[in-house]
Amino acid sequence: MEYYAQYLRGLREDHDLTQKDIARVLGTSQTMYARYERGANELPIRHLITLCQYYKVSADTVLGLDRKR
């Protein structure tokens, strides 16, 4: 599983949100968002940007790039 998939699930759960809530923010279905969280589908850049703005975190954090420094 991709790091970002685990991180996104953790963010969502920390904010007491459902997959359906976040799917609405992204303009996608709950089923598709669940696939992003499982790592079954790659997260499109446009969704990454939207989620970073929504949660107020950097893309480096979501992608785990700041852990490798």
Where are these regions (language model features)?
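Residue-level detection of the helix-turn-helix DNA-binding "recognition helix"
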Residues: 13, 27, 38-40, 67
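Short basic helix-loop element that most often maps to the first helix and adjoining turn
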Residues: 6-25, 50
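Conserved hydrophobic/aromatic packing and binding residues within compact polymer-binding modules
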Residues: 8, 22-23, 33-36, 62
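Short, basic-rich loop-to-helix N-cap that marks the start of a DNA-contacting helix
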Residues: 40-50, 69
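Short, charged recognition helix plus adjacent turn
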Residues: 14, 53, 63-69
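DNA major-groove recognition helix of helix-turn-helix/homeodomain DNA-binding modules
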Residues: 46-61
